[in-house]
Amino acid sequence: MKESQVYLELNRSRQHDFLYPLIFREYIYALAYDHGLNKSMILLENEDYGNKFSSLIVKRLIIRMDQQNHLIISANDSNQNPFFGHNNNLYSQMISAGFAVIVEITFSLRLVSYSQGKEVAKSHNLQSIHSIFPFLEDKFSHLNYVLDVLIPHPIHLEILVQALRYWVKDASSLHLLRFSLYEYCNLKSFFTPKKSISIFNPRLFLFLYNSHVCEYESIFLFLRNQSSHLRSTSSGVFLERIYFYGKIEYLVEVFCNDFQNNLWLFKDPFIHFIRYQGKAILASKDTSLLMNKWKYYFVDLWQYYFYVWSQSGRVRINQLSKYSLDFLGYLSSVRLNPSVVRSQMLESSFIIDNAMKKLDTRIPIISLIGSLSKAKFCNTLGHPISKPTWXDSSDSDIIDRFVRICRNLSHYHSGSSKKKSLYRIKYILRLSCVKTLARKHKSTVRAFLKRLGSEFLEEFFMEEEQVFSLMFPRVFSTSRKLYRGRIWYLDIICINVLVNNE
């Protein structure tokens, strides 16, 4: 019943564009901290007082903050101002977590209302990170160039607030958000060291960042649709915002004056745009000259329309046939796959050389060894070393940890076209496990393996074979070529920490 109350009240507040009153509802914080909605009090520990706090403290804090003038408060006043210090960090986390839940649910309700009248593909399989690679196999083999874009960060806090201003019209909520950003983050940049960001809720941070980046995508989508006369529904939800429609009137005039002579150069029905982890990829069948135009278009768009400083070096042009693209833990490139076809017509026969383009996905072995080196599994040259911090665990726990890491890496990199690099990673983890156990028992690696045997480490290499033997028993019994092929899984929703080492 209370779950319905949450959505009903959100709907009523959304109709009047008032989100600020929801900050004072305890069930908002129950949703934020995954507590049951039947609990009347949200309990959080604070080591300064030793007792518990309810959301009533948050209500009082918001009232007192609203009466403060944050322009005359500086971070150096933390000893004099009662709002600063450890208690204030707790309050900031609670308020930002509640605000994150409010804007997320409000945005999701808007997304649902938008998608009801449109045919939007819904598939849980598309949530997998690996689902993008079959798409790349079908599309990238016909494309020539890729723009590897490093999306710039906003240099001022007000830019992040403006991203919400045009669809959240509640001035009180925006004032609270602006106050929190200025109080608990660096005054010059939102992207400060981890110590400063840790007091701010990461969900709200990601929402603000994605809302800001969606403004880039809206303008890019508008220009792309105007130039190629193709309609896209994947990002259509962002086209309904008042902010975007307000920009269209201004952009039409700008395009007529500034892009009238060269807008036709952008006509390309083979443009594919992918955004991930603060980066973006723009793949096209255009020539290098046209890709350069897209490159400087992005830079000018960031600087002159969004007031974000950027340089041309943040956008790199990559020719897929010559260079590899570092994308989601894989080095992707397009290579020619030569084939010879013999044809016979009547008494004459001739040979046809045919070369087909194929997407090649390889493991970035150098960066992956660097990640293993930082995690103390090997040195910088890739030689396995023991893991002394795990020596206090039992033998079964140590083996289970190594096997789990090995399986996760094998699972994620199952789409590699060359398995040799994957075997090397397995070898590093396997020998590191043996050295860790040998060091724990104060023995040598040779003596330890001789005493226990090597059967207990077969899990490192047998898991994939067991999976394939269950999936394809007949094929697997006659040939193991399938095991050497590329397999994309549909259950990978996050990148392994060792893979995502940037």
From Swiss-Prot:
<dbReference type="GO" id="GO:0008033">
    <property type="term" value="P:tRNA processing"/>
</dbReference>
<keyword id="KW-0694">RNA-binding</keyword>
<dbReference type="InterPro" id="IPR024942">
    <property type="entry name" value="Maturase_MatK_N"/>
</dbReference>
<keyword id="KW-0819">tRNA processing</keyword>
<dbReference type="Pfam" id="PF01348">
    <property type="entry name" value="Intron_maturas2"/>
</dbReference>
<dbReference type="Pfam" id="PF01824">
    <property type="entry name" value="MatK_N"/>
</dbReference>
<comment type="similarity">
    <text>Belongs to the intron maturase 2 family. MatK subfamily.</text>
</comment>
<protein>
    <recommendedName>
        <fullName>Maturase K</fullName>
    </recommendedName>
</protein>
<dbReference type="GO" id="GO:0009507">
    <property type="term" value="C:chloroplast"/>
</dbReference>
<dbReference type="GO" id="GO:0003723">
    <property type="term" value="F:RNA binding"/>
</dbReference>
<dbReference type="InterPro" id="IPR024937">
    <property type="entry name" value="Domain_X"/>
</dbReference>
<dbReference type="GO" id="GO:0008380">
    <property type="term" value="P:RNA splicing"/>
</dbReference>
<keyword id="KW-0934">Plastid</keyword>
<comment type="function">
    <text>Usually encoded in the trnK tRNA gene intron. Probably assists in splicing its own and other chloroplast group II introns.</text>
</comment>
<dbReference type="GO" id="GO:0006397">
    <property type="term" value="P:mRNA processing"/>
</dbReference>
<keyword id="KW-0507">mRNA processing</keyword>
<dbReference type="InterPro" id="IPR002866">
    <property type="entry name" value="Maturase_MatK"/>
</dbReference>
<keyword id="KW-0150">Chloroplast</keyword>
